[in-house]
């Protein structure tokens, strides 16, 4: 993952994630192969902020059936990024 935009897939906008935005915590869906250091570097490069810590969660795919064929949905990884107190707010989430 040479590019920072390959690490960060999309923001996660849920009721809980919007509540913790006041504490400078932002939630993103990230590549499943990315580690915390790569996620931190990608956020700092894209948004030009300082990251205090990164918490990650791995989700397994859910079993799904289509007729007699069974399979799984894609697995995913979610990261909650906490910014330092002196960092600016991410304007990406304004109006949410």
UniProtKB/Swiss-Prot annotation:
One of its GO terms (biological process) is translation. Pfam families: Ribosomal_L23. InterPro entries: Nucleotide-bd_a/b_plait_sf, Ribosomal_uL23-like, Ribosomal_uL23/eL15/eS24_sf, Ribosomal_uL23_CS. The keyword Ribosomal protein applies. Keywords: Ribonucleoprotein, Ribosomal protein, RNA-binding, rRNA-binding. Part of the 50S ribosomal subunit. Contacts protein L29, and trigger factor when it is bound to the ribosome. This is Large ribosomal subunit protein uL23. The gene is rplW.
């Amino acid at each position: 993952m040479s590019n920072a935009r390959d690490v960060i897939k999309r923001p996660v906008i849920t009721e809980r994630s919007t509540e913790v935005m006041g504490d400078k915590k932002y939630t993103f869906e990230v590549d499943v192969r990315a580690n915390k250091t790569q996620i931190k570097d990608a956020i700092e490069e894209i948004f030009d902020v300082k990251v205090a810590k990164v918490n990650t969660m791995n989700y397994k795919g859910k079993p799904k059936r289509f007729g007699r064929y069974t399979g799984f949905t894609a697995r995913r990884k979610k990261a909650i990024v906490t910014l330092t107190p002196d960092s600016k707010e991410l304007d990406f989430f304004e109006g949410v």
